[in-house]
A protein has these predicted regions:
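Hydrophobic, small-residue-rich transmembrane alpha-helices and their short perimembrane loops
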Residues: 1-72
């Protein structure tokens, strides 16, 4: 039972930030498409803004690995 709870915690540590990242990237992507259509010189900034929410998933993955390694 303990290993199942650790696996659940690790899955939630990655899954919840992944859902939040998907929502944020959808909003940023749609706004970015409109911005780049009007001002093409902002494409570099929009790529950076699109990548920023990915840090949530990366940090969630790190937390999941730490959970698995600490209790395994």
């Amino acid at each position: 039972l303990e290993k199942a709870l650790i696996a659940l915690a690790a899955a939630l540590a990655v899954g919840i930030p992944a859902l939040a990242t998907a929502y944020a990237q959808a909003k940023i992507g749609s706004a970015g498409a409109g911005t780049v259509a009007e001002k093409p010189e902002t494409s570099g900034i929009m790529i950076i803004l699109e990548a920023i929410p990915e840090t949530m998933v990366i940090l969630g993955f790190v937390v999941a690995i730490m959970l698995i390694l600490q209790f395994a």
